[in-house]
């Protein structure tokens, strides 16, 4: 689906202000996967994200998206199709809304790619239903809606382009806890429908709950990758790099360090923690 091979990126190369942001990145996003990218501010994850849909081109190495190869020598006309294959929901996407009605805003993207108005509005209606926005809102101005509803409109606008990969850049930033949970459940539902998803986040619990593969970035390098269940076992390594772990993993690790219990494998979700503690309680009771 998407493959990075020895990708390096330098801002303002061949100048006194040259600044290298990515170092020999090898990364793969498989079709149908839910891949997470984790890192602090300055880790390179935003630069990497912009390579996913061709907003940036590698200084060295190559990025393959489907059958399109992007390198330092690629022309813009060669890269443009990548932007239809990979849809990016940037932070606070509602700031990009501009049309007079919700339906028109969502239909704008498909029309911009040459789809007739009637068909574009049909696609828009399907995507608005997908994101859970009732038709009573479709003829309203997007600016009459709540923040969470506006974000759903913006996400529907990206989905209306029917991308093969949906990239989410800190998608719950600024939302209250209830809206945040609803938003993550929405993305999981979209993923379950067959959509390939890439999540850029600093929230480890979201990675544990939803992702099936994760890459950790630090200062432009991938320092760890694997399934969340494997990566989050390295609690001390992550702490040394000032990266957190899911709350359930932290609790289990602290409990294990007291000597009260030994886990074969640390849980990464609340559900796993409850199951393990219940099992230990039952076994302990059986011994008594």
UniProtKB/Swiss-Prot annotation:
Keywords from the UniProt entry: ATP-binding, Cell membrane, Membrane, Nucleotide-binding, Translocase, Transport
GO cellular component terms, semicolon-separated: ATP-binding cassette (ABC) transporter complex; plasma membrane
Superkingdom classification of source: Bacteria
Active site: 170 (proton acceptor)
GO BP terms in the entry: cobalt ion transport
Pfam families noted in UniProt: ABC_tran
Localization (cell): Cell membrane
Membrane topology: Peripheral membrane protein
Ranges of residues in domain ABC transporter: 2-244
Gene Ontology molecular function: ATP binding; ATP hydrolysis activity; ATPase-coupled transmembrane transporter activity
PROSITE patterns, per the entry: ABC_TRANSPORTER_1 (PS00211), ABC_TRANSPORTER_2 (PS50893), CBIO (PS51246)
EC number assigned by the record: 7.-.-.-
Chain sites annotated for binding ATP: 39-46
SUBUNIT field: Forms a stable energy-coupling factor (ECF) transporter complex composed of 2 membrane-embedded substrate-binding proteins (S component), 2 ATP-binding proteins (A component) and 2 transmembrane proteins (T component). In L.lactis forms a stable complex with EcfA' and EcfT and substrate-binding components. In E.coli forms a stable complex with EcfA, EcfT and individually with 3 tested substrate-binding components (BioY, NiaX and ThiT) with a stoichiometry of 1.1:1:1.
Classification via NCBIfam families: ECF_ATPase_2 (TIGR04521), PRK13634.1 (NF010155)
Function of the protein: ATP-binding (A) component of a common energy-coupling factor (ECF) ABC-transporter complex. Unlike classic ABC transporters this ECF transporter provides the energy necessary to transport a number of different substrates. In this organism these probably include biotin, thiamine precursor, niacin, pantothenic acid, queuosine precursor, riboflavin and thiamine. Uptake of niacin or riboflavin into proteosomes containing EcfA1A2T and Niax or RibU has been demonstrated. Uptake requires hydrolyzable Mg-ATP and is substrate-specific; NiaX-containing proteosomes did not transport riboflavin.
Entry's family note: Belongs to the ABC transporter superfamily. Energy-coupling factor EcfA family.
Identification of the protein by name: Energy-coupling factor transporter ATP-binding protein EcfA2
Gene for this chain: ecfA2
